[in-house]
């Protein structure tokens, strides 16, 4: 059993010690998972965009990725994302631990439970139309608390809380869209947070995210033209902090789950 899984992108490929690649065939496609050691335990890592970072956000096979971790009996997932700042107070370089999200994607496969597919969760079959709750916590409170505690231990400043807005991509958002997201209460905007978080909940897996602000979103604080190079540059500067933060977080995550995430399917697993 692998207790903790990590989903991330560039810069984290060398995170694990003694890594090996395992290909898992899921009902939703295959997934290459890197298994290795971190913080004294075996950990699974999935490069969200593929090993060569070839998949755009809307083509990522989120269901295969999450189900592969389910097959490994992962209970906790720590994810990382690069985000733009909707809230002017969140400067580039800020690390945000979001507490909620708004899903503005349009054409992604967002659920395991389409009424026809049967899947296994903790060795038990689940099928039909399943409606999981995203309240009272959208992201796992135990992982979030562990991330924040780890950051405090490191002396690393993080923003506790924020609303993540997920867009389809590949283009960056328009100034009008960002104004609309701000009115809706959004703080940061990215392209990979959904449906990842809700799919984890559908598998009763705890999930939380570490979001790195790489730029101001369109029209915020004078932002004019956004470039992918800008995003990569800022994220690369923070990769050492993020890597250490993940390791310190794993050391602090409780071995026994007491959060509501574990009971997400309780009414369906009878």
From Swiss-Prot:
Annotated binding of phosphate, by residue: 10, 48-49, 192
Highest taxon of the lineage: Archaea
Annotated positions binding substrate: 191, 215-217
Positions bearing the site annotation: Important for substrate specificity: 173, 228
GO biological process, one term: purine ribonucleoside salvage
Annotated catalysed reactions: a purine D-ribonucleoside + phosphate = a purine nucleobase + alpha-D-ribose 1-phosphate
Subunit and interaction comment: Homohexamer. Dimer of a homotrimer.
NCBIfam families recorded: PRK09136.1
HAMAP family: MTAP
Protein name: Probable 6-oxopurine nucleoside phosphorylase
Species of the source: Korarchaeum cryptofilum (strain OPF8)
